[in-house]
From Swiss-Prot:
Sequence ranges of Basic and acidic residues compositional bias: 1175-1195, 1202-1212, 1221-1230
Annotated signal peptide: 1-24
InterPro entries xrefs: FN3_dom, FN3_sf, Ig-like_dom, Ig-like_dom_sf, Ig-like_fold, Ig_I-set, Ig_sub, Ig_sub2
Subunit description: Heterodimer of an alpha and a beta chain.
Protein name: Neuronal cell adhesion molecule
Length: 1284
């Protein structure tokens, strides 16, 4: 089965030889075939439909065609036969239909205006050209007019009318002053589309007498100017501000009709003070992205490539601080006919069927008419094999006499389309056009394309065989292209051999053998290495290669991607590069490139040059400056300078440096002139005209340079013509309609005389234009406006001064400004290579549509969704740029099993063109990522529970999970491996029948239909018994728990230290450690070692009032630790000199408080047993607010300090394993005294009469909390409540 595949650019020359019978545009252009096969005429070249000619030159109307036999040509003019033999001024080129009208003999071009049509005819039919309308261009003179000065009040608006003469085509308008400088434009002052100059408000600086409107007629390359306009602005104080008023267009609404594919230009210019700002919107829609541009300071809305969807109302609003105004332009987009399906040539064999289809669209809908051989089909000779059905012609059982050329005409009121398509009936046996025994050579592991170009009618079938009489080639390892080419995607060494192509149709068969050789790839087996070399040492890079013995390699060395310096220090050997006596300039990247006729490889290394170790040096002095400078032998262009050397200071003078000063152009600046050996004391100096010279001399020895000598006397040379022209002349457009010519100005001493100016000349290349020139001064740039977009120009810049011109300058080629590309790449195709790589192909855009320097193509691609999760996510577009005129590229890093979209855009120096339609493609499944986690819980005697999470990236449809596990003994030796396959919808598994007290290692991964993904590992241990019962130690009678445990970690905190205690169950002689840190901090845990096997430890040096986290661990016991605990140190005290706990009054007071609370509890208990009511008021009085107790927090005597012993006692009645924080703040669910219990929430514990229930029942597993959330210590009353 044939499979379509794009053909690389290197095979483009083969395309003309490939036969595509039904859709072919032509018979293959093989010279032998063309001598034998008949072919109807085909128009290959013709002049444009609307052809504007230069009236000063001969008129050339092109008409070229091909066919077999060669066609003859005839013309009509204005619908009637044009007999060129009767017009001596008209000739037809030999073997061509092109007409040449000679107007050099005084004949006016206007005499040949009209509508021309060419017919190319041979025995198989006739093809016709478009109707070519010939019109000579016109550039009439400006009408004479008397222009009155414009007197305008400051702040008023002003319009300077241009009204250029009506030309063909219309001229390009621009405003300049009498110095040929463009008038500056801004939001306030700008040129309208009609060429007029608009002032939103005038300012005093607008006063001038040289507002000049210029009209450039491109066809005749002439520029005409209007009489200068004078503007006088007079000031009035104060200046009156005005709201916006539209200067153009007038009124509140207007209409605009534009044709599809054209550029829509809408304009709004407003008057007002302050200057109004223009804003554009489309009512009921959005301005089209990527096609909308704002020009002329947003006064012009430009939409390129308009379509019917751009019809609608466009509103411009002008606004300033005093108000706003608006205008609505109703845009209607009509369309001249455009092709949906243009008719294509048919090559049929006798008896075959075929169709010609001609479908076009437009607005209004175009009408379709058919012609045959240039004659309307209704009056053409009948053909029984032909049936016309609207836009389709159906052919049935054609015969050789059915050959003809058919014309389809689609027309509406805005234009027409005319297409020729021939039907050529041929009966030809197969022919293979590829030369016999052609040799193809490729590198192993790369694609091999073996050609079998063919022709035949009917279309032959192609088969490939290995060898001369081998078996037919089939299978996925081969790709068969419709053009007959055989592709081996990955050629191997055993692919070498003979391949036979067989072409057959009903008229016969033929075959051809070709040879394929697969070569070993070229490799660099020893690459250059990074080097750090000291100055003056030697550096050597190796580049040892291995290559196919039948290929001849060439080795090239580069430095920083450029050729090696032309320096004898660089020695290139067979497989190495040696650099002698390295210097700092040798720093860089050195690349070895190996090329053969079939492949190329490279490798690079960096050379770093460092300073050599310092060596002791003998100190010498620099020479003294030279003396007694004298000028002799003065001539116009030379002079002799002599001097006396100064002292050498023990180091011989090696050379003298001569410098000069130009007192006329750059006084005070010294320039290098020349240098001579140290043995010379005179030198002949070359001079330039028009320079006031002074000279000085500097002596140089090995130590350095002397101070400069005293300057010589001055010498002024005579003026002369410039000797040279400006350098670095360039022409690059900054806008689509201009050409910016730049150059490097001559320096003052290069001017050779006063009055330095530049003659700037330009003309469009390949158009036979006259040179256009301007003379400018004191600038290095000139802007040519009104140029076509991106066309080549010949440019030259010549220097001149008051004495004359410099020599004729050389010409350079520049280009006018680029514009955004107009056309999107077509025929975008995606070939998915594997789950993470795809290849994208596209057809190159026409070079004319690029409208600039083609820089390459950009491919935008993004993931739409994962096919396994069906969930969209944030779209992150990626961009790959392919430089140059490439038509394919690779998309790496794709996610498997995902849906992607891409589009392609062409790029030039201006930016990106429109995007091609989005192309959707999908990547196949890949292997999944590892499961997101593996957790092992619930260890028992013989089982473990495994829980896991699905892979973060399934990369396909999960088919199963693979679990492997094996036991590990104490020496880390692995036991037998067990493998289990688990359904993909499971997320947990209970492994049973395991050995007790055994460590297992687990390996876990997921699978798709493609294969297994990466695995994660985990270890776990079964326990000896589920109750944690201790077992007797062998021979000792002692019992030890199977697993050591640390539990019931408690803390008692003071201001700067805390007592940590815990309970331990496990083997004797454990070594404990305590880890702690600030709660909520990301800092590492601090570690303290506990001496001996004690079960308590005092942490010292803590910060007062700080919350800490703490945990206890044991060394050498598989690194186990207790769970984390929290505590907080007490606030800092002003003084701690008196231990309050030892004071007698404190002890007495505490006893009295305890006794009072005990009495209250007894009374409450008695009243409750009697069932009596407990009024709320009495309860509130008895349960006084802690904040109004006599022992308040701020008296400095209670609540701030607790001994470690009392703190430890406070914790004893707590529920096992829990602890109340040192600030006595208890969570809501752990407190009986919370506001919820007092009725603030839905769980309040009140009786119907409002009395408290269970207020003093004293749930011992919970502690009461303070009524507020203060971090201060509690009052003694609350402390006693927690004790009861």
């Amino acid at each position: 089965m044939m499979k379509e595949k794009s053909i690389s650019a290197s095979k483009a020359s083969l395309v003309f030889f490939l036969c595509q019978m039904i859709s072919a545009l032509d018979v293959p252009l093989d010279s032998k075939l063309l001598e034998e096969l008949s072919q109807p005429p085909t128009i290959t070249q013709q002049s444009p439909k609307d052809y504007i000619v230069d009236p000063r030159e001969n008129i050339v109307i092109q008409c070229e065609a091909k066919g077999k036999p060669p066609p003859s040509f005839s013309w009509t003019r204005n619908g009637t036969h044009f007999d060129i033999d009767k017009d001596a001024q008209v000739t037809m080129k030999p073997n061509s239909g092109t007409l040449v009208v000679n107007i050099m003999n005084g004949v006016k071009a206007e005499a040949y205006e009209g509508v021309y049509q060419c017919t190319a005819r041979n025995e198989r039919g006739a093809a016709i050209s478009n109707n070519i309308v010939i019109r000579p261009s016109r550039s009439p003179l400006w009408t004479k007019e008397k222009l009155e000065p414009n007197h305008v009040r400051e702040g008023d608006s002003l319009v300077l009318n241009c009204r250029p003469p009506v030309g063909l085509p219309p001229p390009i308008i621009f405003w300049m002053d009498n110095a040929f400088q463009r008038l500056p434009q801004s939001e306030r002052v700008s040129q309208g589309l009609n060429g007029d100059l608009y002032f939103s408000n005038v300012q005093p600086e607008d006063t001038r007498v040289d507002y000049i409107c210029y009209a450039r007629f491109n066809h005749t390359q002439t520029i005409q100017q209007k009489q200068p306009i004078s503007v006088k602005v007079f000031s009035t104080k104060p200046v009156t501000e005005r709201p916006p008023v539209l200067l153009t267009p007038m009124g509140s609404t207007s209409n605009k009709v534009e044709l599809r594919g054209n550029v829509l230009l809408l304009e709004c210019i407003a008057a007002g003070l302050p200057t109004p700002v223009i804003r554009w919107i489309k009512e009921g829609g959005e301005l089209p992205a990527n096609r909308t541009f704002f020009e002329n300071f947003k006064k012009t809305l430009k939409i390129i490539d308009v379509s019917e969807a751009d019809s609608g109302n466009y509103k411009c609003t002008a606004r300033n601080t005093l108000g706003s105004t608006h205008h609505v332009i109703s845009v209607t987009v009509k369309a001249a006919p455009y092709w949906i399906t243009a008719p294509r040539n048919l090559v049929l064999s006798p008896g075959e069927d075929g169709t010609l289809i001609c479908r076009a669209n437009g607005n209004p809908k175009p009408s379709i008419s058919w012609l045959t051989n240039g004659v309307p089909i209704a009056i053409a000779p009948e053909d029984p094999s032909r049936k016309v059905d609207g836009d389709t012609i159906i052919f049935s059982a054609v015969q050789e006499r059915s050959s003809a050329v058919y014309q389809c005409n689609a027309s509406n009121e805005y234009g027409y389309l005319l297409a020729n398509a021939f039907v050529n009936v041929l009966a030809e046996p197969p022919r293979i056009l590829t030369p016999a025994n052609k040799l193809y050579q490729v590198i192993a592991d790369s694609p091999a394309l073996i050609d079998c170009a063919y022709f035949g009618s009917p279309k032959p079938e192609i088969e490939w065989f290995r060898g001369v009489k081998g078996s037919i080639l089939r299978g996925n390892e081969y790709v068969f292209h419709d053009n007959g080419t055989l592709e081996i995607p990955v050629a191997q060494k055993d692919s070498t051999g003979t391949y036979t192509c067989v072409a057959r149709n009903k008229l016969g068969k033929t075959q051809n053998e070709v040879q394929l050789e697969v070569k070993d790839p070229t490799m660099i087996i020893k690459q250059p290495q990074y080097k750090v070399i000291q100055r003056s040492a030697q550096a050597s890079f190796e580049c040892v290669i291995k290559h196919d013995p039948t290929l001849i390699p060439t080795v090239i060395w580069l430095k920083d991607n450029n050729e090696l310096p032309d320096d004898e220090r660089f020695l290139v050997g067979k497989d190495n590069l040696t650099i002698m006596n390295v210097t700092d300039k040798d720093d860089g990247t050195y690349t070895c490139i190996v090329n053969t006729t079939l492949d190329s490889v490279s490798a690079s290394a960096v050379l770093t040059v460092v300073a050599a170790p310092p060596t002791p040096a003998i100190i010498y002095a620099r020479p003294n400056p030279p003396l007694d400078l004298e000028l002799t032998g003065q001539l116009e262009r030379s002079i002799e300078l002599s001097w006396v050397p100064g002292e050498e200071n023990n180091s011989p003078i090696t050379n003298f440096v001569i410098e000069y000063e130009d007192g006329l152009h750059e006084p005070g600046v010294w320039h290098y002139q020349t240098e001579v050996p140290g043995s010379h004391t005179t030198v002949q100096l070359k001079l330039s005209p028009y320079v006031n010279y002074s000279f000085r001399v500097i002596a140089v020895n090995e130590i350095g340079r002397s101070q400069p000598s005293e300057p010589s006397e001055q010498y002024l040379t005579k003026s002369a013509n410039p000797d040279e022209n400006p350098s670095n002349v360039q022409g690059i457009g900054s806008e689509p309609d201009n050409l910016v010519i730049t150059w490097e100005s001559l320096k003052g001493f290069q001017s050779n005389g006063p009055g330095l100016q530049y003659k700037v000349s330009w003309r469009q290349k390949d158009v036979d234009d006259e040179w256009t020139s301007v003379v400018v001064a004191n600038v290095s740039k000139y802007i040519v406006s009104g140029t076509p977009t991106f066309v080549p120009y010949e440019i030259k810049v010549q220097a001149l001064n008051d004495l004359g011109y410099a020599p004729e300058p050389s010409e350079v080629i520049g280009h006018s400004g680029e514009d955004l590309p107009m056309v999107a790449p077509g025929n975008v195709q995606v070939h998915v290579i594997n789950s993470t790589l795809a290849k994208v192909h596209w057809d190159p855009v026409p070079l004319k549509s690029v409208r600039g320097h083609l820089q390459g193509y950009k491919v935008y691609y993004w993931k739409v969704q994962s096919l396994s999760r069906r969930s969209k996510r944030h779209v992150e577009k990626k961009i790959l740029t392919f430089r140059g005129n490439k038509t394919f590229g690779m998309l790496p890093g794709l996610e498997p099993y995902s849906s992607y979209k891409l589009n392609v855009r062409v790029v030039n120096g201006k930016g990106e063109g429109p995007a091609s339609p989005d192309k959707v493609f999908k990547t196949p499944e890949g292997v999944p990522s590892p499961p997101s986690f593996l957790k092992i819980t619930n260890p028992t005697l013989d089982s473990l529970t495994l829980e896991w999470g699905s892979p973060t990236h399934p990369n396909g449809v999960l088919t199963s999970y693979i679990l492997k596990f094996q036991p590990i003994n104490n020496t880390h030796e692995l036991g037998p491996l067990v493998e289990i396959r688990i359904p993909a919808n499971e997320s947990s598994l209970i492994l049973k029948n395991l050995n007790y007290s055994t460590r297992y290692k687990f390996y876990f991964n997921a699978q798709t239909s493609v294969g297994s993904g990466s695995q994660i590992t985990e270890e776990a241990v079964t326990i000896m018994d589920e109750a944690g019962i201790l077992r007797p130690a062998v021979g000792a009678g002692k019992v030890q728990p199977l697993y050591p445990r640390i539990r019931n970690v408690t803390t008692a905190a003071a201001e700067t230290y805390a007592n940590i205690s815990w309970e331990y169950e496990g083997p004797d002689h454990a070594n404990f450690y305590v880890e702690y840190g600030v709660a909520g901090s990301k800092e590492d845990w601090k570690k303290e070692i506990v001496n001996g096997s004690r079960s308590f430890f005092v942490l010292k040096g803590l910060t007062p009032g700080t919350a800490y986290k703490v945990r206890v661990g044991a060394e050498g016991l598989s690194g186990f630790r207790s769970s984390e605990d929290l505590f907080e140190t007490g606030p800092a005290m002003a003084s701690r000199q008196v231990d309050i706990a030892t004071q007698g009054w404190f002890i007495g007071l505490m006893c009295a408080v305890a006794l009072l609370i005990l009495i209250l509890l007894i009374v409450c208990f008695i009243r409750r047993n009697k069932g009596g009511k407990y009024p709320v008021k009495e309860k509130e009085d008895a349960h006084a607010d802690p904040e109004i107790q006599p022992m308040k927090e701020d008296d400095g005597t209670f609540g701030e300090y607790r001994s470690l012993e009392s703190d430890a006692e406070d914790h004893k009645p707590l529920k096992k394993g829990s602890r109340t924080p040192s600030d006595r703040t208890v969570k809501k669910e752990d407190s009986d005294d919370s506001l919820v219990d007092y009725g603030e929430g839905v769980n309040g514990q009140f009786n119907e009469d409002g009395s408290f229930i269970g207020q003093y029942s004293g749930k011992k597993e919970k502690e009461p909390a303070e009524g507020n959330e203060s971090s201060e210590a509690p009052s003694p009353v609350n402390a006693m409540n927690s004790f009861v």
